[in-house]
Amino acid sequence: MKVDFDDLNNIFFVGIKGSGACSLACFLNSKGYCVEGVDVSDKFYTDEILSNNKISYYDNIYEFSLKQLDRSFDLIVYSSAYNKDGLQVLLEAKELNIPILSYPEALGELSRKYYSIGIAGSHGKTTTTAFLGVLFNKLGLNPNVIVGSSVKDFKDNSAIAGISNIFIVETCEYKKHFLNFSPNMLILTNVDYEHVDFFKNYEALEEAFLQYINNLKKNGILIINSDDNNLLKIKRQINRKDISIFSYGSGDLSDFQISNIAVRSEYFCFSFLGLLNVELKTVLFHNVLNFSAALLALNLFLESNGKSIFDFEEAIKRIAKNYSGIKRRVEVVKEENGVIYMDDYAHHPREIKNTLFGIKNFYKNKRIILDFMPHTFTRTKEFFADFVEVLSAADILILHNIYLSNRENFNPDELSVKLFLNIKKINKNTYFFKDVKDSINFIKSLLISGDLFITMGAGNNFILHDFL
């Protein structure tokens, strides 16, 4: 369905607490649209973002009726977490002939009038989008940005409504959602088998990424991480003579190589694109890759406008050194009584492995206490052995029942306990609490000065920080 956002005024979001839907709602709200929505009453990190943007919403999504509203709407946007034919509010909108778009469809329609830069990949797309958005914004390029989490340098918002024609957007591979998007420039961070409820094998996922590359506008630009073998394989299959392909990475196969990598205090120091001794505030090496992707994209954009990153060298170095991070990405929630409290969104075995390795390497003398909530039954089942291996690396592990997605109807109890028992065989310091809040007193009894406590996963165990 074609929609011209210039003709719209009132927009209603169904599932407004979803990370993408929330970001788009905030973006449109900042652009002057009248935005409202509905979702469940459960607490999500997006509650705070919506509140900060003064966006009102109802919390009874399954019972909600459009009759509760005192005005009509020009467009309904629904989160892809929900079935279009499964909610009363969407069925009512259809009967009333109100245009209905999924979040990725709405994003695609909105992007048509901009010079768009899409960021995708199995891991790191949120951070890379944030890096690129922060760079463009702080260098005065007035971008429009939509990120799947709140960015501290955006005043804890997940979107920026700029005045330029630049549109920087995080795009997702799940259910091929990113195929609604046709960018001028595309950054691919990596490709890893994921979303097993939709992609039946790795080849199906790979084909989706190839389709996305083919969605690039004529004479578009593709940026890939040459440290990722799967992306190198995909690169060999590209049959677009009109697009320009550039690669970044720490290995010799990259067009633009990251070098002189070192850890200094709370910074990774490196050189890239001729910029020497860039100090990036991060504890994880893969963020060096993500920042380098953003730098390369920035430089290519600047060069097309007669400039380069050397015109902004000192400013870029300041941005890297003072980068404040994003919500739920190795986020330091607080430091209290000698304990560091962190939260991270890692929910795939590769993400967990990289994050744990980075934290252990950075905080060498700290005891790592990991509280993990598996997310989705299908992911836990498919990568069961990998989860057992990577989670057992924590000094102390606390597990909870699998957090099911809205699309799943499984009973999570048996698989959750099975995961716990298999890890317990490897790491005796593994504990299981079906419900998150049941673990509060136990965690309090564990923590001593010098510990690092981190909640991890795409579930709701991050609420523990409110009680510790």
From Swiss-Prot:
UniProt entry keywords in alphabetical sequence: ATP-binding, Cell cycle, Cell division, Cell shape, Cell wall biogenesis/degradation, Cytoplasm, Ligase, Nucleotide-binding, Peptidoglycan synthesis
Pathway stated in the Swiss-Prot or TrEMBL entry: Cell wall biogenesis; peptidoglycan biosynthesis
Any one cellular-component term (Gene Ontology): cytoplasm
InterPro entries found in the cross-reference section: Mur-like_cat_sf (IPR036565), Mur_ligase_C (IPR004101), Mur_ligase_C_dom_sf (IPR036615), Mur_ligase_cen (IPR013221), Mur_ligase_N (IPR000713), MurCDEF_pg_biosynth (IPR050061), UDP-N-AcMur_Ala_ligase_MurC (IPR005758)
Coiled-coil annotated residue ranges, if any: none
Enzyme class: ligase
Residue sites binding ATP per the record: 121-127
Location of this chain's protein in the cell: Cytoplasm
UniProt record, GO biological process: cell division; cell wall organization; peptidoglycan biosynthetic process; regulation of cell shape
TM helices/strands, residue ranges: none
Catalytic activity: UDP-N-acetyl-alpha-D-muramate + L-alanine + ATP = UDP-N-acetyl-alpha-D-muramoyl-L-alanine + ADP + phosphate + H(+)
EC nos: 6.3.2.8
Entry's Gene Ontology molecular function annotations: ATP binding; UDP-N-acetylmuramate-L-alanine ligase activity
Function: Cell wall formation.
Stated family: Belongs to the MurCDEF family.
Listed name of the protein: UDP-N-acetylmuramate--L-alanine ligase
Organism: Borreliella burgdorferi (strain ATCC 35210 / DSM 4680 / CIP 102532 / B31)
